[in-house]
Amino acid sequence: MRFLEILGILVCSLDSVTGRVLPKPRDVPGVLTELVTMKQQWDKGAANTSYVLSGDSTTANGTVPNSGGWGNGFCASLSPGTPCINRAKNGATTASFRTDGSWNMTIESARQEVANGRKTWVTVQFGHNDMKVMTPEAMGVNLMKFVDEIRGVGAEAILITSLTRRNFNSDNATLDDTLGPWANETILISEQKQTHLIDLHKWSVWYVEKIGPDAAHRLNRLPDDNTHLNANGTTVFGRMVADLMLLGLSPDIGPILPNISLSSKIWTGKAVY
């Protein structure tokens, strides 16, 4: 049985702990094995593709040692020399990101990459801080404006749902998911604006529940910090974002390099670290 088929069976099986039916096999990035053959195509496109990342601390570059968001790990998955500009900012909401000038820097980066002749992808992932100060609907209004302005400079928008927190319920099997409404709003806006979507929230919840609290907390920046990532966490979830892009957007997404060893562990629900 091929690796692709094994992944489909494993991820679609009934979860024995939670009793929930997991997503359909076609959602599973088992196709990565076959995407390896496209490596030459990605390499050729490297000079003509760029990425600009926006969001909060779960995407941002780390400001202290052994920390960072998934953006670090995602940029590391690209062919060498591919521009990957991380404009995400710690503590940001969809409102503060605009008022403090971070959004202007994001758009200007995208504008320059487009002017340089590159196909430019701009990722947008918020929710962790928005949930503290605004409704999902208010965040959605801000996301719609972001998408319009990304398109206005000739770039492609990718909305990404919030990376899960790693707070487990008392059963030590399921997560206390407080981000769901904001993730659902992101999905709704992607449908309304007919733009690209990466459902990182769904798949990070699935993965964290599969590996359990002990392994999940080994990805924490600090022992009791279930939101922010250490260097290992950035590698795992950066790879997850890369794989989801390959699954949902390939071959248009550009020079993302496969990592079958790491992906195999992630998509069979095994702890990497």
Question: What residue ranges belong to the model's regions?
Answer:
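Serine-esterase "nucleophile elbow" of acetyl-processing enzymes
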Residues: 20-90, 107-115
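Surface-exposed amphipathic alpha-helices with a cationic face
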Residues: 144-154
